[in-house]
UniProtKB/Swiss-Prot annotation:
Activity vs pH: Optimum pH is 6.6. Activity is completely abolished above pH 8.6.
Biotech use: Due to its high optimal temperature and stability under a broad pH range and high temperature, TcHly8B could serve as a promising tool for the industrial production of hyaluronate oligosaccharides and promote the further exploitation of hyaluronate lyases with novel properties.
Encoding gene, per UniProt annotation: tchly8B
EC number from the UniProt entry: 4.2.2.1
Protein name, as recorded: Hyaluronate lyase
Keyword ATP-binding carried by entry: no
Source organism: Thermasporomyces composti
InterPro entries in UniProt: Chondroitin_lyas (IPR008929), Gal_mutarotase_sf_dom (IPR011013), GH-type_carb-bd (IPR014718), Lyase_8 (IPR038970), Lyase_8-like_C (IPR011071), Lyase_8_alpha_N (IPR012970), Lyase_8_C (IPR004103), Lyase_8_central_dom (IPR003159)
Its biological purpose: Degrades hyaluronic acid into unsaturated disaccharides as the end products. Exhibits very low activity against various types of chondroitin sulfate variants.
Length: 778
């Protein structure tokens, strides 16, 4: 449903509690009796329950029945006592149990109101829920109680209870509603919104707005609306959205795929709630939020999943996997489409439709955690023939503010997760993400158009070897669970440069709780990512590995794997080291090439673990997964070790062998601690990461920087960035004749263009983003 001021004012003469065609209990009122707050409350109910769908057809019929069964379970097990409403959720040991109790009440309210649950209009359900609500807000969510996690008191519990009160507003009556509003005012004090940023601020604005609706408070409505304004600006440090598309939460963490989604959920709900009302969101900076959908969120979605690289500690939660997060984002984008321009709305719906149609298991429409509203919105898009599903883009994006990069090709996607003095190694709080120590030292992820889409979903994090994460160079020194929270590296060089299709990405690595140092680069090309490492030095007294890949084959995977042509058995535990291997291939995933040959090791094994091992709130059930791991052993305490390898997602065995045999495809121009560079003549590509001033082939620079050159059709595009984000001007000399400068960014000054090209590139205040010039070749 599209919300606007005309439809809002017209609705003042009509009332239904949870959307057209949805409510079994109709309460007619005169137009005079329905004030603006009544309509806002009814609109919020519609946003909670969904509208415009037929409860007698799938996928709604079975979902409504499941909702009813869940509510019935809560009804039959409800047993208010001294310390709980439900025996399995003691309220004196965990404030999270208070939030979960509130959510159960909300489920009961929804089951009572919507058709097809088997409890529609069931007075016993409503009466039990109201009685339990009375208990909760008298003895538990009430002053002077205050302990545990602040989030449950200010956000989690009132979010669910707001929905509950809106849904059962008339059953609760003025006295209980008024008392509840006072509870919210006590915990969400007048300064609460202004003390928060990012997702927390969005959540609190939502809590305040719905509380304002329930209490009919214009002041609270204005406070909630105005509280959104600081979210709708670009930041240059700390929490929020950055111009390059980054989203940071908790000061130092890439959190687009967790807190970022939560922010979009809250804000999209408020746009829908307030549209056309006295408190409509009209801040001109709201375009920042609209732009974030394609600038911040969509680049991290592939075939409907939202990449783990930007999910922080959430990767340790069993239920909140990459597909589930993608579902939440899709639902929020569809809701936000109601607020965007017609062009944006059409494009966003097309993006989401593409995600829905391409997604592998677990699919959106089978996700039982989604609300009826989210399912109804998605079904409407799927059923609309005028909405064209948009394909995955072919592009490269560097998110310099949060040290992330994403490379997209027609049949695969690849992500690189880095850290620097700007971003902490990993976050572990509340007993979560206990072994995430090395997720930021160059971890790589990749997925194919039709393979590997459940690789990280299927028990990867509790069963994978945390010392051999793909792409990382790591000391085997044992680390304690949870060590190093909020610790930042001292190295500044992380990032790279891109022409929008290919890229040179690099990182000066510093490992957590280790003496390990080194340089890593990834050159992202058409059918491969070329990976270089150099200057790898460590004095921990432990072996150091570079992990080429650690592939999860599932519980019983028997994929064919060959190292330099030597097959591995498909069962049991197997390991092999080949002194001069040139290639490896894993059926169903892709190939790996080692130019010039390398000492390569591989393991096939069954690994076990539980979610509890990495998250104290996770189940203890043991999981078993089969893995193939390919790695380079640099030995104990290496000095200036190096490597070169290619990852070829989706490549067949024959394609891998051909690339390994082609000695002319790749030229490694430099691979030292000061500079890493390659040339691929067939692509007209040169990429160079300078960790110090110097010369590589025809390129000379006077400051640390990243440079990419693409030559095609008589022109060259020169791209430059400052991954350290602390420089002022970089002089780049390309020792090749040029005829003229076709175009350049305002930051690029042409010093010389003739027998050679000399550019002075102002990188100060460019935040690590790429600066470009295009020249015609002589």
């Amino acid at each position: 449903m599209s919300w606007n001021r005309r439809s809002f004012l017209g609705a003042l003469g009509v009332t239904c509690l949870a959307g057209a065609g949805m409510v079994p209990i109709v309460r007619p009122r005169t137009a005079a009796a329905a004030d603006e707050f009544d309509l806002l409350r009814e609109r919020w109910c519609s946003l909670v329950t969904g509208s415009g769908y037929d409860p007698d057809v799938e996928p709604f019929k079975s979902r409504l029945a499941a909702l009813g069964a869940e509510a019935e379970q809560y009804l039959t097990t409800l047993a208010p006592g001294e310390t709980s409403l439900w025996p399995d959720l003691p309220l004196d040991t965990s404030t999270w149990n208070m939030t979960l109790s509130a959510r159960r009440l909300r489920t009961m309210a929804v089951a009572y109101l919507v058709p097809g649950t088997g409890h529609t209009g069931n007075s016993a359900m409503a009466e039990a829920a109201v009685t339990a609500f009375d208990e909760l807000t008298t003895r538990f969510y009430a002053p002077p109680h205050w302990w545990g996690n602040w989030w449950d008191w200010l956000i989690g519990t009132p979010q669910a209870l707001n929905d509950f009160c809106a849904l059962l507003y008339e059953q609760l009556g003025p006295e209980l509603i008024d008392r509840y509003v006072q509870r919210v005012d006590h915990y969400v004090d007048p300064g609460a919104i202004d003390r928060t940023t990012g997702a927390n601020r969005g959540w609190l604005c939502e809590v305040t707005a719905v509380r304002g609706v329930l209490g009919k408070s214009p002041e609270m409505m204005a406070k909630a609306r105005d509280g959104l304004s600081p979210i709708m600006v670009y930041v240059t440090d700390g929490d929020g959205f950055y111009r390059d598309g980054s989203f940071i939460q908790h000061e130092y963490y890439a959190y687009t795929g967790s807190y970022g989604i939560s922010l979009l959920q809250s804000v999209s709900g408020l746009f829908a709630l307030l549209a056309g009302s006295t408190w409509e969101i009209v801040d001109p900076n709201r375009q920042v939020l609209f732009d974030s959908i394609e600038n911040s969120f969509a680049p991290f979605v592939y075939n409907g999943l939202l990449m783990d690289a930007v999910a922080g500690r959430v990767i340790s939660r069993e239920a909140e996997h990459d597909h589930w997060r993608g579902h939440l984002l899709a639902a929020s984008v569809l809701r936000m489409a109601e607020a965007g321009s017609p062009e944006e709305a059409k494009r966003w719906r097309g993006i989401v439709k593409g995600w829905l149609l391409r997604e592998s298991e677990p699919r959106y429409m089978g996700d039982q955690t989604l609300t009826m509203a989210a399912v109804a919105d998605a079904q409407a898009v799927l059923d609309d023939p005028t909405i064209e599903p948009l394909p995955e883009p072919v592009e490269h994006r560097i998110f310099a503010a949060m040290d992330q990069a994403v490379h997209r090709r027609p049949t695969w996607a690849f992500s690189i997760s880095m850290r620097s003095v700007r971003t902490a190694f990993y976050e572990t709080i509340n007993g979560e993400n206990l072994k995430g120590w090395h997720t930021g030292v160059g971890m790589t992820y990749w997925w194919g158009a039709d393979f590997g889409n459940d690789h990280y979903t299927d028990g990867f994090w509790p069963t994978a070897d945390p010392y051999r994460l793909p792409g990382t160079t790591v000391s085997r020194k044992p680390l304690e669970d949870g060590v190093g929270n909020n610790v930042l590296p001292t190295e500044a060089w992380a990032g790279g440069t891109t022409d929008g299709e290919f890229a040179a990405v690099g990182q000066s690595i510093q490992a957590l709780e280790s003496t390990l140092r080194g340089r890593k680069s990834w050159f992202c090309l058409d059918d491969a990512v070329v990976c270089l490492g150099a200057g790898i030095t460590c004095a921990d007294g432990y072996a150091v590995d570079t992990t080429v890949d650690q592939r999860n084959l599932g519980e019983n995977g028997v994929h064919d794997f060959r190292l330099n042509g030597i097959p591995s058995p498909t069962s049991g535990t197997w390991s092999l080291t080949v002194p001069n291997a040139r290639w490896a291939h894993l059926e169903g995933f892709g190939g790996y090439v080692f130019p010039g040959g390398a000492r390569v090791s591989a393991i096939r094994e069954t690994r076990t673990g539980s979610w509890y091992d990495i998250n104290v709130g996770g189940p203890r059930d043991e999981l078993r997964r089969r893995y193939v791991t390919v790695y380079l052993d640099h030995g104990v305490d290496p000095v200036d070790a190096s490597y070169v390898y290619l990852v070829m997602p989706g490549a067949t065995r024959q394609e891998t062998i051909r690339r390994a045999a082609d000695r002319r495809w790749l030229r490694v121009l430099a691979n030292t601690a000061d500079r890493q560079a390659i040339s691929v003549p067939s692509l007209g590509f040169v990429g160079a990461n300078f960790f110090a001033p110097g010369t590589v082939d025809a390129l000379t620079v006077d400051q640390p920087c990243s440079v990419l050159v693409r030559v095609a059709d008589g022109r060259a595009t020169i791209c430059v960035s400052d991954p350290r984000q602390d420089g002022s001007t970089v002089r780049v000399t390309w020792n090749r004749p040029v005829a003229s400068v076709v175009s350049s960014d305002p930051t690029v000054r042409v010093v010389e263009a003739g027998e050679r090209l000399v550019l002075d590139v102002t990188v100060e205040e460019t935040a690590g983003m790429t600066q470009r010039a295009v020249v015609a070749l002589a």
